[in-house]
Amino acid sequence: MAKTSMKVKQQRAPKFSTRAYTRCTICGRPHSVLRKYGICRICFRELAYKGQIPGVKKASW
């Protein structure tokens, strides 16, 4: 889990635009965030298995 201080820090506008980064809206994880959904791969996987993300289904080929 991300530190509360880092979550608050990320909400502020960055001094320089290149310092902005995405963070998972559920757990606050800064890496591997899917832009389309705004959540990290771990949270995405959990929600997809539960069927809570519309239009997402398990791939099989």
Curated annotation (Swiss-Prot):
GO terms for cellular component: cytoplasm; small ribosomal subunit. Gene3D superfamilies: 30s Ribosomal Protein S14, Chain N. Pfam families: Ribosomal_S14. Zn(2+) binds at C24, C27, C40, C43. Binds 1 zinc ion per subunit. The keyword Hydrolase does not apply. It comes from the Bacteria. Transmembrane segments: none annotated. Keywords: Metal-binding, Ribonucleoprotein, Ribosomal protein, RNA-binding, rRNA-binding, Zinc. One of its GO terms (molecular function) is rRNA binding. GO terms for biological process: translation. Its cofactor is Zn(2+). HAMAP family: Ribosomal_uS14_2_B. Part of the 30S ribosomal subunit. Contacts proteins S3 and S10. Binds 16S rRNA, required for the assembly of 30S particles and may also be responsible for determining the conformation of the 16S rRNA at the A site. PANTHER family: 30S RIBOSOMAL PROTEIN S14, SMALL RIBOSOMAL SUBUNIT PROTEIN US14M. Belongs to the universal ribosomal protein uS14 family. Zinc-binding uS14 subfamily. This is Small ribosomal subunit protein uS14.
